[in-house]
Amino acid sequence: MQNQRIRIRLKGFDHRLIDQSTAEIVETAKRTGAQVRGPIPLPTRKERFTVLISPHVNKDARDQYELRTHKRLVDIVEPTEKTVDALMRLDLAAGVDVQISLG
């Protein structure tokens, strides 16, 4: 795989799960002899929701909720066949969304 790069983006609501999954990916790639750039923390997306507590009156009574989406980026430069094989067999946490692109 000459002049190839694997870019892995991880998304999730729990930053500890994302950091743990990122560490597994980096350790697997380094063990198989590939160069790793990252993990690079990307900006966290914060969604805020305001909900009225009372169904009829009391407009001032509200609850506010926040949903944070944490993101990480890992680049694997010059991957070997063993690296791709090991990454395909890797079992990550259920709360982490993984997007893989070749470039």
Curated annotation (Swiss-Prot):
Database matches in InterPro entries: Ribosomal_uS10 (IPR001848), Ribosomal_uS10_CS (IPR018268), Ribosomal_uS10_dom (IPR027486), Ribosomal_uS10_dom_sf (IPR036838)
Keyword match Transmembrane helix: no
Listed Gene3D superfamilies: Ribosomal protein S10 domain
Keyword Ribonucleoprotein: yes
BP-aspect Gene Ontology terms: translation
GO cellular component: ribonucleoprotein complex; ribosome
SMART domains associated with the record: Ribosomal_S10 (SM01403)
Record's keyword terms, sorted: Ribonucleoprotein, Ribosomal protein
Domain of life: Bacteria
Any single Pfam family the record assigns to this protein: Ribosomal_S10
Example of a GO MF term: structural constituent of ribosome
Subunit structure: Part of the 30S ribosomal subunit.
HAMAP family: Ribosomal_uS10
Family: Belongs to the universal ribosomal protein uS10 family.
NCBIfam families registered for this protein in UniProt: PRK00596.1, rpsJ_bact
Job of this protein: Involved in the binding of tRNA to the ribosomes.
Entry protein name: Small ribosomal subunit protein uS10
Organism: Shewanella amazonensis (strain ATCC BAA-1098 / SB2B)
Gene coding for it: rpsJ
